[in-house]
Amino acid sequence: MVPAVVHLCVVVLTCAWGCSSRENSSYKPSYRGARVIDLEDIGFDDGDTFSLRGRRIRVLGIDTPEIAHPEMGILENQPYGIAASESTMAWITRAERIEYVPGGRDRYNRRLAHVFLDGELLAIRLIRAGLAYQTVSHYGDSGFPDLAQQILDASRNAPKPQFTPPHRWKRKQRQKSGG
């Protein structure tokens, strides 16, 4: 009986080691410098911003419609803002692999990053869904010319979003609130 138990343990441990080593050795990052993110480390804010272990991350290359942020003078949700937020949350939650490639910081001290879900740029998913405007033509490529070009191409081939560009909508909201 003991040899059978020992044999079973050896088989299970060998398989477990083999499976995990295959998984690790087959991992290929979606982009140079990409870092894998664990879902439990993510908190959701809106369509283009989330937190990673408490630090705010802003998705590069896009701008999604706003959701209410009274502390910033945005008192109501922009049309499609909830849809963009919910889509981002659903896509991230369902992804088997979440990666980000950190860039610089914005004026709000958020970390700027490209985000990949199962190898696809989140920015491109949002653009194709009509839930984001590209911002590459305004802010430049942020040191990622190839990714910026992919975002521009997706934007050219996607339907135009059915909402006011968020920077214009935000300006009007702040004027209404006196801020």
Listing of model-derived features with the role each one plays in the protein:
Residues 3, 7, 15-179:
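Small beta-barrel nucleic-acid-binding modules, primarily SNase/OB-fold domains
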